[in-house]
Structure formats: C-alpha cells, structure tokens
C-alpha cells in the first residue's frame, strides 16, 4: 500500500490508541498485516492522509517503510527506538521521500544499518548528528542512490565495529562533499563500490582509512569507479591499497 503521509500516534500514557478510540474520533480503520513491515499495525484513513499507529517499542525495523513510494515526509520524533537493533532497508526505495526528522531517533543498540536510506532519490538532506553508531557492524549500501544529497556530515559516526562499507555512498551523484575524517576502518573487510558513481565528488579525505583487514582486490573493487571529477591531488590518503585502487578506477 502506498503512503501519502505518516506519523506516529501514541496515547499520553504510552499505550496504543485502540480501534474503538479511533472509530469514535471518526477515523476509517483497517488492519494491515505483513510479515516484514507494519506487522499488526493499524492504518487510518482520514482527509486523504494515511496515519500509521505503531507499537510503543520495537527491536526490528527492517524494511518498515520499504517501497512506500508516495511517502513524501515522515516525523518520527515520538518513536521509541531504544531497543531497536536492526534498521536495515527501513526507508529503502522511498522514492518520493524528501523530508525526514530523525533528531530523536535513538540508535544506541543498532547493529545493522545496511541500505537504510538506499534509493531515497528525492531526499535533499539528512541530519544524522544524533545517531550513535557504536554497535553498528553493517553499513552496506546505507546511502546508495541518494542522488539529490549534496553533502553528508558523518563526523559523529563511530565506525570502529563496522565490517562492511560496500556500496555505502554508491551513486550519490550530487554529492560534492563528505566529511569522513573521524572514520575508523580498522575492522572493515569490504569497501567495494563505496564511492562508485559519485560523479560530482571533487575531493575526499581518507587519511584515517586503514585497509589492513581487506584481503583481496574484489573487496575494494570499483571503490571510486565513476568518480569523474575526483582528482588525485584532492584525495588525502595514507594506505597503499587505496592508492592502488585509485590508480585502477581513475586510470591514473
């Protein structure tokens, strides 16, 4: 089912609003059951808007809004995510999503953020300054094909436990700047296609990148492929494996 608008409604005491409560308020209610998203959650229709009623606590948000292709904005300011461990594919393929408020989104226990925002190709900007990523081990495809975002600030990201960064920023074709100066890649085993097709990226600082855990060329394959504006003099790096991959991808 396509979504026009979404927000969270909880009772003041934290309990779920009941079906009877909503019928009394004039909502047309129905239950939408799906094994992977919105499981046993209620969908309400009123004034051409669709409102989702969520449980008070979750531990798995995998694919929750996946392929909600008409969703344009979402406010998750009241969402209790303190127990969540998986946000993979959460907003994947939300092609019309251009605004999202994650300022109160707690990620303290999240271990998997793979493809979380993948193919959100209408998203102009995203504020992740409150994200805590200390336990995250998978960022594969996290921002892949966010083709309208011009800048992402990830300075607060703790990536010391991340093992997979493949396709992380792949096809962010409008991205001109990104701050990765605090990235810790000591445990990363996969960086293939990490920046591939970032065709507007002109400079990048990879001074802190450590590729010791990367064993084969396939694990860095096409890391910078399609970065047509990226010049070697604007790339800071110390790891010889990065230099080798730059030589291959940029045909230096």
Which role does the model predict for each range below?
Residues 64-65, 90-94, 116-120, 142-146, ...:
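Periodic small-residue-enriched repeat registers in elongated scaffold domains
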Residues 57, 69-72, 83, 95-99, ...:
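Canonical position 11/12 of the leucine-rich repeat
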Residues 24, 75, 86, 101, ...:
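Residues marking helix boundaries in flexible regions
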Residues 51-63, 78-89, 104-115, 130-141, ...:
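Short, solvent-exposed linear patches
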Residues 1-82, 206-215, 221, 225-252:
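N-terminal capping/linker segments that flank leucine-rich repeat
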């Amino acid at each position: 089912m396509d979504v026009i608008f979404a927000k969270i409604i909880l009772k003041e005491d934290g309990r779920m609003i009941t079906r009877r409560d909503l019928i009394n308020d004039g909502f047309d209610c129905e239950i939408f059951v799906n094994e992977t998203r919105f499981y046993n959650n209620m969908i309400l229709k009123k004034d051409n808007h669709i409102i989702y009623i969520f449980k008070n606590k979750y531990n798995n948000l995998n694919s929750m809004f996946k392929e909600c292709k008409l969703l344009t904005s979402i406010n998750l300011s009241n969402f209790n995510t303190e127990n969540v461990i998986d946000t993979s594919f959460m907003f994947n393929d939300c092609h019309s999503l251009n605004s999202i408020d994650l300022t109160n989104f707690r990620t303290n226990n999240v271990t998997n953020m793979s493809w979380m925002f993948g193919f959100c190709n209408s998203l102009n900007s995203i504020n992740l300054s409150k994200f805590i990523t200390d336990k995250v081990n998978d960022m594969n495809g996290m921002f892949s094909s966010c083709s309208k975002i011009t800048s992402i600030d990830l300075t607060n990201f703790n990536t010391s436990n991340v093992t997979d960064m493949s396709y992380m920023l792949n096809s962010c074709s409008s991205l001109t700047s990104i701050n990765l100066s605090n990235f810790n890649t000591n445990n990363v085993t996969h960086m293939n296609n990490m920046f591939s097709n970032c065709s507007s990226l002109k400079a990048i600082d990879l001074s802190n990148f450590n590729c010791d855990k990367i064993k084969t060329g396939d694990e860095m394959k096409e890391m910078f492929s399609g970065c047509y504006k990226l010049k070697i003099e604007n790339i800071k790096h110390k790891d010889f494996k990065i230099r080798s991959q730059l030589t291959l991808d940029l045909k230096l």
